[in-house]
Amino acid sequence: MLKPLGDRVIISFVETEEKSVGGFVLAGASHDATKTAKVLAVGDGIRTLTGELVAPSVAEGDTVLVENGAGLEVKDGNEKVTVVRESDIVAVVK
């Protein structure tokens, strides 16, 4: 498993299917500004100018919304994952 550094987060995108009121399936990521992802690993955080460590706002296992197109796709064994900065994460889904 990869261990992200600093404020980086390793995620795996979740395929979602959206339906309109009429029951038609819409093309998921083609029109959305965000994508849903599962957090697989989180870095230790980022240091301020005074050296204090600011802990990340997300945790392993969280479901998050990420800006579409953000991050770097890498392979971890046979699995494709994406490394993003915490600032690319828009919200945590509760």
UniProtKB/Swiss-Prot annotation:
Pfam families: Cpn10. Keywords: Chaperone, Cytoplasm. The keyword Zinc-finger does not apply. GO terms for cellular component: cytoplasm. It is found in: Cytoplasm. InterPro entries: Chaperonin_GroES, Chaperonin_GroES_sf, Chaprnonin_Cpn10_CS, GroES-like_sf. One of its GO terms (molecular function) is unfolded protein binding. The keyword Transport does not apply. SMART domains: Cpn10. GO terms for biological process: chaperone cofactor-dependent protein refolding. Signal peptide: none annotated. Its main location: cytoplasm. It comes from the Bacteria. Heptamer of 7 subunits arranged in a ring. Interacts with the chaperonin GroEL. HAMAP family: CH10. PANTHER family: 10 KDA HEAT SHOCK PROTEIN (PTHR10772), CO-CHAPERONIN GROES (PTHR10772:SF58). Belongs to the GroES chaperonin family. Together with the chaperonin GroEL, plays an essential role in assisting protein folding. The GroEL-GroES system forms a nano-cage that allows encapsulation of the non-native substrate proteins and provides a physical environment optimized to promote and accelerate protein folding. GroES binds to the apical surface of the GroEL ring, thereby capping the opening of the GroEL channel. This is Co-chaperonin GroES.
